[in-house]
Structures are given as C-alpha cells and as structure tokens.
Amino acid sequence: FMQIFFIRTIKEGYTGCPVIVRFIQLQTPTTQKAYAAVHKDYQVLAKSTSGGAFTAIADAVFAQDGIVYGVAMMDNMQVKHIRTSNKEEFAVLRSSKYLQSDTGNTYQMVEQDLKQGKTVLYSGTPCQIDGLRHFLGKPYERLYTVDIVCHGVGSQAYFDKYLDFARKRYGNIKTLRFRSKEYV
C-alpha cells in the first residue's frame, strides 16, 4: 500500500522527501557512495558529536574566505540555521540537534553570498538541501552542501512541549546536549 501511495502521489506532483521520491522514481536499488571521516585534531574531535568532519569541511571553506551555514541551538532552545563567516562563529554549529531546524531567511542569504562570488557551504537535512537548490533555481559552482542523515527528525513544537515538562520537573534548563561525551 505504501509504495502504491507514494507512486500515485509522485505522479500527482508529490514533492515530499527527496530521498523517498528519488527511490520510488528509480524503483531499482542503486549503488551510493558513502564517506566516513574523523577529524585529526583531538580537541575538535572531543567537541564534536559526529567525528568533526563538518568542522574540517568548514575550515576549508573559511580558508577561501567563504561562508558556512548550519544549525545552532539558540539560547531559547530553538533550533535555527545561521550564517557564520569564521571559526569562532562556527563553534555553535557543532553537535547534533535531532530536530527540524528553522531555515529562516538563510536561502536568500545564500543566494546573496553566491551572487557576491563567495564560496558557500550549507548543511541540512536532505529536504532542506533540496529546498535550497529549488529556491536558487540553478546550480552554483561555489555552493557546497552537506546532507545530514535524516531519520525523521522531530518537530520544534513537540520538543517545546518536552522542554515545558522538563522545566516543571527539573527547573531552568541552562544547556542541552543530545549526544554528550561527558561520561565517555
């Protein structure tokens, strides 16, 4: 039933998850390339939750006077995409968030940066990357994207309800880590 539903909706113009759409359109398994990496600097590795690969890629972009967009947990526990232009600003993008982030006006900002000749790195879920590409309407040679593995990320609204529960039970929440290395 599920496959029939997706095939029917694709024919009717379904534009949902790009991974599901691509899989159903192909209808045959394809070989994909996958890469694994770990940052060489132990300090970066210790501050990162997924090996520090994003930091290494971002460093290469910053070395070209480029711009890096990624997801930050704001002080109010909202998860948002932000623009960073140096390593100091980038530090808040480290660590996993496990929530669908608010892209805000970052697509417009990316377009502006690209039109100014900047190298741009944008990290997000596959649907966010697909949304960025559709927004831009054409490929850009200086745009690099990192699609994080999506496993059905949770919504901010649901997370806010959890935070309300946690605040009532434990009091004020100062920091939050989804994958803490404190006890490793």
Regions found by a protein language model. Give the residues of each.
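Iron-sulfur-associated redox domains of electron-transfer enzymes in respiratory
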Residues: 25-184
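Iron-sulfur cluster-binding cysteine motifs and their immediate structural context
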Residues: 1-10, 14-29
